[in-house]
Amino acid sequence: METATLVXISISGSLVSFTGYALYTAFGQPSQQLRDPFEEHGD
């Protein structure tokens, strides 16, 4: 394969992996540990 193809595949794979990890952190099991500043702020 050409170098440009390998670079494009590795960058795309990294982006997909990062997006998956971000979604898992936001909506998956670790999201239970996140705090909500709007919930803590009482008017």
UniProtKB/Swiss-Prot annotation:
Coiled coil: none annotated. Pfam families: PsbN. Its main location: plastid. The keyword Coiled coil does not apply. One of its GO terms (biological process) is photosynthesis. It is a single-pass membrane protein. The chain crosses the membrane at residues 5-27. The keyword Thylakoid applies. InterPro entries: PSII_PsbN. It is found in: Plastid, Chloroplast thylakoid membrane. GO terms for cellular component: chloroplast thylakoid membrane. Keywords: Chloroplast, Membrane, Plastid, Thylakoid, Transmembrane, Transmembrane helix. Belongs to the PsbN family. HAMAP family: PSII_PsbN. May play a role in photosystem I and II biogenesis. This is Protein PsbN. It comes from Calycanthus floridus. The lineage of its organism: Eukaryota, Viridiplantae, Streptophyta, Embryophyta, Tracheophyta.
